[in-house]
Amino acid sequence: MTPLALIMIIAAYLLGSISSAVLICRLLRLPDPRTVGSNNPGATNVLRVGGKGAAAAVLLCDMLKGTIPVWLGYYLKIDPIILGVVAIAACLGHMYPIFFHFKGGKGVATALGAIAPIGFDLTGMIMATWLVVAFLFRYSSLAALVTVLLAPFYAWLVKPQYTLPVAMLCCLIVLRHHQNIRRLLDGSEPKLGQKKSA
């Protein structure tokens, strides 16, 4: 691994560690998303506690945390596997942020942002899948899980050289959703627009 690759991996983790949800909620004087709703500092929980505007801001910032380091690596023609590690580092920063006591989000938006530089076709397929599943079933977590399970197949169709990095990233997202999977199975997972009961 080259020094440049190592620097990019560390920088991606540190950028990912900036918790958009916590900072935006502080700025807007909203409750800390780590202590209300689903206790997850992500766009879906901010939607529950702060509305669409705050959630959209969090979504955009979380995506940029993945897009910026991966786009830079893609521009510098870093090996696809290393690029995958950079993407994972950004997501790990979001999930376990060093600046916020390692209590972070699920990494879905950051992962989408990390995949975006690979191509608009792949990004469009991923976003369309999430939107369709979310619209039909009203579960953000289910939409995320279905999307990440299909994402490696989409990558294989349009950019096969990135199939393994995308699959690595998706495995991380699935593991991070283990509690959501349990709640989906027992019927206690809150739907979109529904406040999580205490």
From Swiss-Prot:
Transmembrane segments: 4-24, 53-73, 80-100, 117-137, 139-159
Biological process according to GO: phospholipid biosynthetic process
EC assignment: 2.3.1.275
Protein topology in the membrane: Multi-pass membrane protein
Keywords, in A-Z order: Cell inner membrane, Cell membrane, Lipid biosynthesis, Lipid metabolism, Membrane, Phospholipid biosynthesis, Phospholipid metabolism, Transferase, Transmembrane, Transmembrane helix
Localization per Swiss-Prot or TrEMBL: Cell inner membrane
Reactions performed catalytically: an acyl phosphate + sn-glycerol 3-phosphate = a 1-acyl-sn-glycero-3-phosphate + phosphate
GO cellular component terms, A-Z: plasma membrane
GO MF annotation list: acyl-phosphate glycerol-3-phosphate acyltransferase activity
Enzyme superclass (EC): transferase
UniProt keyword Ion transport present: no
InterPro entries on file: G3P_acylTferase_PlsY
Main location: membrane
Pfam families the UniProt entry points to: G3P_acyltransf (PF02660)
Pathway(s) the chain acts in: Lipid metabolism; phospholipid metabolism
Family to which the UniProt record says this protein belongs: Belongs to the PlsY family.
PANTHER family: GLYCEROL-3-PHOSPHATE ACYLTRANSFERASE-RELATED, INNER MEMBRANE PROTEIN YGIH
Record function comment: Catalyzes the transfer of an acyl group from acyl-phosphate (acyl-PO(4)) to glycerol-3-phosphate (G3P) to form lysophosphatidic acid (LPA). This enzyme utilizes acyl-phosphate as fatty acyl donor, but not acyl-CoA or acyl-ACP.
Subunit architecture: Probably interacts with PlsX.
Protein name: Glycerol-3-phosphate acyltransferase
Gene encoding the protein: plsY
